[in-house]
Amino acid sequence: MTTKLARFAQKRWISSTTSTSNMYDPRVFRDPVTNVQELRKPLDSDDERNFLFLKAMKSDATPVFYRDHVIDKLIRVCTKDGEKETSRKNVLSALEIIKRRQYKAWAKASEEEKKSIELDPFLVAKKGIKNCHPLMKLQGVTRGGTTYQVPFPIEEPEAEFRAMKMMRDICRVRSKHGETHFKDILATELLAASQNEGSTIQAKQELHKTCEANRAYAHYRA
């Protein structure tokens, strides 16, 4: 039985050493090129991509000008009850509001002030989210029947997710209380965060203060 399985794996280009959840054999598949400039360059004669297969490109890696990894992730984080299209409309509407507000401020500014005003809403949003990245997180650790909130360092992808989640929760609470629409609150929060201001920045600072207060429990990490 084992011999037959090995022969089948060799015929079908399936690796018998890698995880079964990996559909691409690393011996014969390579990552796709998603950069437009790289795609236009000819391959060298000895480039292995001339002889091997390429993996299917992920849907969020499409090399088009209106797609952005951070914005796509924000759309997914803001999705509620599977209504991704509604989330997309809210996020893109927030970016449009940012564009209008920034252009209005730019039109009224002096020539010197115009240089410091960013008109690209994607850059404003990404800067705001970046400023909200927490450096630490609190995680429950049980010792002797007692659970302690222990501060842990945080990796960049999780920091980005937590920044988006904090901003999303703040916007949802404020919109639920009838202050204004979600898209308007999100635009305001992104603009404020790009200047290191706003409720999300305050939430991040409060988290850091709590982590600092709980640093005595840091030895529970091990």
Curated annotation (Swiss-Prot):
Disulfides per UniProt: none
GO cellular component assignments: mitochondrial small ribosomal subunit; ribosome
Entry's localization field: Mitochondrion
GO MF term list: mRNA binding; rRNA binding; structural constituent of ribosome
UniProt-listed GO biological process terms: mitochondrial translation; ribosomal small subunit assembly; translation
Alphabetized Gene3D superfamilies for the sequence: Ribosomal protein S7 domain
InterPro entries cross-referenced by the UniProt entry: Ribosomal_uS7, Ribosomal_uS7_dom, Ribosomal_uS7_dom_sf
Keyword entries, A-Z: Mitochondrion, Ribonucleoprotein, Ribosomal protein, Transit peptide
Family: Belongs to the universal ribosomal protein uS7 family.
Protein name in the entry: Small ribosomal subunit protein uS7m
Gene: mrps-7
